[in-house]
């Protein structure tokens, strides 16, 4: 269990920082077919050293940020586990926390793979290193949580691994221009946090997570002219509302289907390039961030068995507030 907004913001910042590695020139050995099996030839000592340095820096950063941000003010007497479940109606945040871990793992692993490749690892080895490092970092976060009020949630660690593995699989299939995961914020009526100090955990009512089908990549594979459709994405998304403060009958778990704008494709069309110091972080940001009011569609509330829309996912009546 962790503060979802802080974690996903951290993943976005990490992605932008790691993206700077693209400006480092490095060798690119042949890419084996397998997603995770390393190349048959070991990297030279300099590449191994740099890979260890990058891995150590990431793990050290995880420990420092965890201590300064969460653990030092939320420690308990002993390590303990917590079974949070997955996406069920009675689970923590209605499962939004698990989807947050999935998307965060995807973002960090994808960018770490780029970083490892730029310092000389083969593409396959880079994906393997990124998947392992992202998963290990997730376990370290959960281990720290085990000594806090949150507890060690093995489901969070599995969700991190799933997101990291998904990133590796998509990249190995050379499908990054076709599918991807994003995180976004939507407006939602959230009461002021009076009485919140005694409780803990995130409110996910303003967060939305999407799996995107990018029409530009689809038409490219069909050898067809996409025309203006190349600027669109079809998305399936998930989000929960009210689990932090609303009575049970008001809480929602929404599965949505949207049509939205592909901001990366639009920016590229107007001349934004990864080769510039400002273009790369801008394109990276919109690769992983879903801008509000750029996607519209319908949502199905799993808790109440009803559809809502046409909208952005910002409709919610919190009812009588009672912070937990």
Regions found by a protein language model. Give the residues of each.
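Transmembrane beta-strands of outer-membrane beta-barrel proteins
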Residues: 179-181, 230-236
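Interfacial helix-loop-helix junctions of multi-pass membrane proteins
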Residues: 141-161
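Residues that define the transmembrane beta-barrel architecture of outer-membrane proteins
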Residues: 203-209, 249-257
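Bacterial N-terminal signal peptides that target proteins for export
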Residues: 2-12
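Residues on the lipid-exposed face of transmembrane beta-strands in outer-membrane beta-barrel proteins
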Residues: 165-166, 209-215, 257-263, 298, ...
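N-terminal targeting leaders of membrane proteins
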Residues: 14-17, 23-98, 102-109, 113-121, ...
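Outer-membrane beta-barrel proteins
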Residues: 114-120, 168-173, 213-224, 263-269
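Transmembrane beta-strands of outer-membrane beta-barrel pores
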Residues: 185-189, 238-242, 263-265
């Amino acid at each position: 269990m962790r503060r979802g907004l802080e974690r996903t913001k951290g993943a976005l910042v990490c992605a932008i920082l790691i993206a700077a590695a693209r400006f480092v020139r490095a060798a690119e050995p042949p890419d084996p077919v397998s997603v995770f099996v390393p190349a048959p030839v070991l990297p030279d000592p300099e590449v191994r050293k740099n890979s260890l340095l990058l891995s150590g820096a990431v793990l050290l950063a995880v420990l420092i940020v965890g201590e300064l941000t969460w653990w030092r003010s939320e420690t308990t007497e002993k390590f303990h586990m917590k079974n949070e479940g997955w996406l069920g109606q009675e689970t923590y945040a209605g499962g939004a926390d698990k989807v947050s871990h999935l998307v965060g793992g995807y973002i960090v692993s994808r960018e770490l793979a780029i970083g490892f490749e730029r310092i000389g690892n083969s593409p396959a080895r880079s994906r393997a290193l990124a998947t392992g490092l992202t998963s290990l970092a997730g376990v370290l976060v959960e281990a720290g949580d085990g000594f806090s009020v949150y507890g060690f949630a093995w489901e969070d660690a599995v969700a991190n691994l799933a997101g990291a593995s998904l990133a590796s699989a998509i990249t190995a299939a050379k499908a990054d221009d076709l599918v991807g995961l994003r995180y976004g914020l939507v407006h939602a009526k959230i009461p002021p946090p009076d009485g919140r100090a005694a409780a803990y955990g995130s409110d996910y009512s303003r967060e939305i997570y999407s799996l995107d089908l990018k029409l530009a990549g689809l038409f490219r594979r069909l050898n067809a002219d996409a025309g203006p459709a190349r600027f669109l994405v079809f998305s399936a998304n998930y989000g929960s509302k009210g689990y932090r403060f609303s009575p049970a009958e008001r809480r929602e778990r929404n599965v949505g289907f949207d049509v939205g704008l592909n901001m990366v494709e639009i920016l590229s069309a107007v001349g934004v390039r990864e080769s510039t110091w400002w273009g790369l972080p801008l394109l990276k940001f919109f690769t992983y961030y879903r801008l509000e009011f750029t996607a519209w569609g319908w949502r199905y509330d799993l808790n109440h068995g009803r559809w809502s829309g046409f909208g952005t996912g910002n409709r919610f009546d919190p009812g009588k507030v009672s912070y937990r």
